[in-house]
Amino acid sequence: MVKDFSAEEIIQYISDAKKSTPLKVYVNGVLGQVTFPDSFKVFGSENSKVIFCEASDWEDFYNDNKNYIEEVEIEMDRRNSAIPLKDLRNTNARIEPGAFIREHAVIEDGAVVMMGATINIGAVVGEGTMIDMNATLGGRATTGKNVHVGAGAVLAGVIEPPSASPVVIEDNVLIGANAVILEGVRVGEGAIVAAGAIVTQDVPAGAVVAGTPAKVIKQTSEVEDSKREIVSALRKLND
């Protein structure tokens, strides 16, 4: 389902999705005669199991078999979740531990998503783009190629309240740490957004903007090359 979602389509998708509360359950006991439901994924030995199941299914199972269960430990990291995390097995990018990337986000080749970054449903991370630590791409936010989104920066989503126009970051843009790009804003190719800026209007290609609200302060041609370099070595994957 890789497509350009509208906000309304995402809202409908979330509304219609079967909500899930998955559990990981560690069980010790006399389990050799216990019959596990087909909906369970069960691993382990006769007297010690690891079970993956839905919370509602576990309650019924436990009540029926608690006389056989001696010890139990339950891990739960979500409740009534509508959107699972993205399956990254076929993603040709560098994804670091602790990044949260939701299903139906697009991560293009050679991208980098750092620890703590959040990529919401419908967002697009372009080829060779780096999403730095704790940055957020809200629903439908889109980056082009070779963009750097600095640590803690926010590209606002357009799911709630629904907005027709997502944030669009064109190719070769640098966004400083803790900058905020508001809904509907387009940042033109090669522009630079200073750290901490709040961008409320479109940014022309090649402009440098700073402040709250952000305003053009100069052109990127006036910035040293070393301060706007995209380092290809950081995007290198295994040969």
From Swiss-Prot:
The keyword Repeat applies. Keywords: Acyltransferase, Amino-acid biosynthesis, Diaminopimelate biosynthesis, Lysine biosynthesis, Repeat, Transferase. Catalyzes the transfer of an acetyl group from acetyl-CoA to tetrahydrodipicolinate. GO terms for biological process: diaminopimelate biosynthetic process; lysine biosynthetic process via diaminopimelate. It comes from the Bacteria. Disulfide bonds: none annotated. Its EC number is 2.3.1.89. This is 2,3,4,5-tetrahydropyridine-2,6-dicarboxylate N-acetyltransferase. It is an enzyme of class 2 (transferase). Gene3D superfamilies: Hexapeptide repeat proteins, Malonyl-CoA ACP transacylase, ACP-binding. InterPro entries: DapH, DapH_N, Hexapep, Hexapep_transf_CS, Trans_hexapeptide_repeat, Trimer_LpxA-like_sf. The gene is dapH. Belongs to the transferase hexapeptide repeat family. DapH subfamily. HAMAP family: DapH (MF_01691). NCBIfam families: DapD_Ac. GO terms for molecular function: tetrahydrodipicolinate N-acetyltransferase activity. Pathway: Amino-acid biosynthesis; L-lysine biosynthesis via DAP pathway; LL-2,6-diaminopimelate from (S)-tetrahydrodipicolinate (acetylase route): step 1/3. It catalyses: (S)-2,3,4,5-tetrahydrodipicolinate + acetyl-CoA + H2O = L-2-acetamido-6-oxoheptanedioate + CoA.
